[in-house]
Amino acid sequence: MSKAFRSILDLSFSLRLKNGRILELVNDSTVKMAPRGALDQLGQALSQIIHAFAEADEDTKIFMAKWDIKDGFWRMDCEKGEEYNFSYVLPQEEGMPITLVVPTSLQMGWVESPPYFCAATETARDIASDYCDTPVGSLPHHKFAKHVKGAKEFNELPTASKKGKLFYALEVYVDDFMSIVIPTSKEQLEHVATAIMTGIHDVFPADIVDGNDPISEKKLLKGEGQYSVFKTLLGFDFDGKRKTMWLEEEKRAKLLTILHSWLRASSLNRGIPFGEFESVIAKVRHAFTALPGGRGLLSPCNRLLKKRPQVVYFHRNAPLHEAISNCRTILRESTSRPTRCRELVAGWPDFIGVVDASSHGVGGVIIGELSECLPTVFRLQWPPDITANVKSEANPMGTITNSDLELAGLVLLWLMMEHVCAPLTEKRIALFSDNSPTVSWVERMACRSSLVAEQLIRVLALRFNIQKVCPITTLHIAGDQNSMTDIPSRSFGSEHKWHFKSEHDLLTFFNTNFTLPSQNSWTVCQPTSAIATRVISVLRMTPLTLDDWRRLPAAGKNIGTTGKSTRLLWEWTLTFRVPTSKSGSDSYPVSQQESEQAIMVTENKSKIAQSVARLRPLGRRSHWPVTPILPKS
């Protein structure tokens, strides 16, 4: 049946009979019994592909192909006797006989259709995976095998190769089957394609007429089943040579046009319907899948989505106008530089930063973990107007919360890490803070409760995007374990024992009390006044433009003795979190202190590993190179 004339039954529609009785909705009366596991994998498909690209070696080529199930729901038969639940009256002209339609297949509008159908396609995917594991060349010829060939890169491969392991991953998203392969021969690609198509036909039987086959011949004729190093998968264009991805060109151009029209409407004092705003922002959010930090620009949009006004006016909402303008700029720039998939995957940190802020100042330390950097400590005293404006019991009228200060401190930590650890492209960073709201805001790259924090999140989003850094691991550190940064943040006179009149005094204290391995020295890096002014301006809610945050002055200047770049210091820092004495006793026994230190190391390793694991997709059986989360000890 032609799509233009195909009817879709709305099973979420309540029906009122002539006698006034209302029939219960089919969806409301449905007892949900379909397997849910298939839907769990549904939302992981794109992430699985991104992670696979990120794990591949630089010198490999990734080939991609995809297959579409034609009229998928209509190929799933109802259990005998259950089809009457979908029956409906065919619309007729007045006076015509009543005609009942009794569908025998799954209906598009039924709440259980997606999980039942996805269970079938996931089963086909698992069968295909088993076929892939058979010896290359052992599967019977498939009638659609000819559609695999033709791409330039395919023709450049040798026909067969006895050396080289076959790496492949299979994904399915509703009715779209996708395979990514690192082959050493044409034979390997043909084997994987045959395995997938055979697996599909084991669940959705083949048709003698190719045009009616479950595997869409129309899509195959368009080249979708042809293995190539360039392919559009789930709305994104992937490059198997450079391991990059970017929003499909047509979708990106349409988004840019819409956002531009919104900004023009603002200049004309016009509004746009809320429905359009909601729909387009959802597409922008999806586009930001391929743009590091992009979500951090959407806080003003999130606030409006919660209010749901009938009309959205940009000229009345400066933060919203700025957010849309920033989003359009980042999307436009992505046209000339696709995102490397490695920029989108978290992992064990190359560098670690720990920060603390008080009403007096901010202090932090920066150390190398998997990569080397100068072990660095920094501090910055807040100006008097900031200290005086901090909200507290003694100052309930203050407009800056402690959490705002902590997030501002974390932004300063990040800017200092850009200076100390550069370059940060494709590096993995862990940031520790003892403030729970700060950790939550950075994890979500969004804030609902503070306009100051909202602007600070925007700053981080812009800087993450510029640096092309991997997803940030943000973790909470207990306050009583954060003395290494408590000290510099309170070193301006509020704590007499930690009052350092100069950066040289701070350096001496750290080298004496936090002695580095191998007689190395700490480096004290002083934030420049220009970079400090930018951070403080956000606390003052002074407007800054996109360029103000994209083109930064030098962030810091080293003071006094400079240490040597080193790595693997994070576990060493944990030795300064175990107390050396308890009230009521002279000291810990050495064995007890060592035991507590070992427990703390294990717990903190687990904390980072769990945080990284949460940013990874659900596990799935595949033959693809994978980097373990925990580094080899």
Q: Which residues does each PLM region occupy?
A:
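Catalytic-core region of right-hand nucleic acid polymerases
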Residues: 1-128, 246, 253-301, 305
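Polymerase palm active-site segment centered on the conserved acidic dipeptide of motif C
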Residues: 34-45, 66, 135-161, 169-171, ...
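Acidic, metal-ligating active-site segments
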Residues: 83-91, 116, 237, 352-382
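Flexible, low-complexity interdomain linkers flanking nucleic-acid-processing modules
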Residues: 238-280, 487-631
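Amphipathic alpha-helical
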Residues: 304-341
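RNase H catalytic domain
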Residues: 414-483, 490
